[in-house]
């Protein structure tokens, strides 16, 4: 979402730079808002309606006491963007029967097959038993792709490599996996023509009676997402939408807005290529991140999940901050995924102020430090004072680094140890237990 954040980040900086808001300033900011929305590929009619609504509120509403007009303008922008992208009501995905059958639809190139595996992985994490069914008889690689992904995430798979009848494959697949909690059925994304594709998915829909029909749309299509959604809606009900590739384009904003306009509910967004990179789409959190307000809730939840698992919080609270605890912290940070994704959640536009080079260097340092710590004995990890020059040389050799690298890491550790009281307070404030 970096591209989208950059577009709106410039707008937010401009708003924060004004000292007061008169008619001329408001008109100028209105044009900037329109430019940002158009760059995000939001449909023109929605851009106009959005701007009119925001300007009307700024003119008619009085900011609460103590709130500067520019801050209130940001608040209005935030609220109107949330409305534009679907409103405050967070989406839900709760299987209500067994098996709960999910039918995935989408055109070729939307990332549908990968999304099937991502959704399965997310549901497995929530404790559901999930199976995957491949019905694509047009694209030969689809069978192997989904089977391999199913093996990677450890879920049952059904498909027929040489099958010709997608409808029968779907029916047999659901029957074979009927003892699971959720069965996700992947369908073809291309056919002889659009009509044939839509007729096939309609026939599969009638054969397996899915509990939820999910349309997968590529974010790069921008405002054209509405046309895709409406084309499928003419043939069968669309219960929810997943927008993929949100990490690679600013046009994702337009795709989200266009889908919301059709009345369909965006439930998930794909934010990377890995099977773990599918997120529940919550408009207010999404908008906060795009505007540079951050999504500390999401960041804290992810950190808490990892650090609680490793019992790092308890160890720091007890005042125990040896190299063993330091190693657990590094392992925990690396479990969060790429640091670029973690930094995107920071507030106040901090992510934009951290260069790609700095993030990459931080990622490399974490991996280097983990290698260094892994080369130490348990005794050394628990008692860092044992680390003399001879031991440091041995550790450096085992980790494939220089003794200087080891000493630099130990300096970072000592600094962190001195900051442990502050860190302890932060953990208590941000991660209530």
From Swiss-Prot:
InterPro entries found in the cross-reference section: AAA+_ATPase, P-loop_NTPase, Signal_recog_part_SRP54_M_sf, Signal_recog_particl_SRP54_hlx, Signal_recog_particle_SRP54_M, SRP/SRP_N, SRP54, SRP54_GTPase_dom
Keyword Nucleotide-binding (UniProt): yes
Pfam families (alphabetical): SRP54, SRP54_N, SRP_SPB
Keywords: Cytoplasm, GTP-binding, Hydrolase, Nucleotide-binding, Ribonucleoprotein, RNA-binding, Signal recognition particle
Example GO biological process: SRP-dependent cotranslational protein targeting to membrane
Listed GO CC annotations: signal recognition particle
Keyword GTP-binding: yes
GO molecular function term, any single one: GTPase activity
Localization annotation: Cytoplasm
Gene3D superfamilies: P-loop containing nucleotide triphosphate hydrolases, Signal recognition particle SRP54, nucleotide-binding domain, Signal recognition particle, SRP54 subunit, M-domain
Binding site for GTP: 106-113, 186-190, 244-247
UniProt EC number: 3.6.5.4
Chemical reaction(s) catalysed: GTP + H2O = GDP + phosphate + H(+)
Quaternary structure note: Part of the signal recognition particle protein translocation system, which is composed of SRP and FtsY. Archaeal SRP consists of a 7S RNA molecule of 300 nucleotides and two protein subunits: SRP54 and SRP19.
Stated role: Involved in targeting and insertion of nascent membrane proteins into the cytoplasmic membrane. Binds to the hydrophobic signal sequence of the ribosome-nascent chain (RNC) as it emerges from the ribosomes. The SRP-RNC complex is then targeted to the cytoplasmic membrane where it interacts with the SRP receptor FtsY.
Protein family per UniProt: Belongs to the GTP-binding SRP family. SRP54 subfamily.
Domain observations: Composed of three domains: the N-terminal N domain, which is responsible for interactions with the ribosome, the central G domain, which binds GTP, and the C-terminal M domain, which binds the RNA and the signal sequence of the RNC.
Protein name: Signal recognition particle 54 kDa protein
Source organism (scientific name): Pyrobaculum neutrophilum (strain DSM 2338 / JCM 9278 / NBRC 100436 / V24Sta)
Gene name of the record: srp54
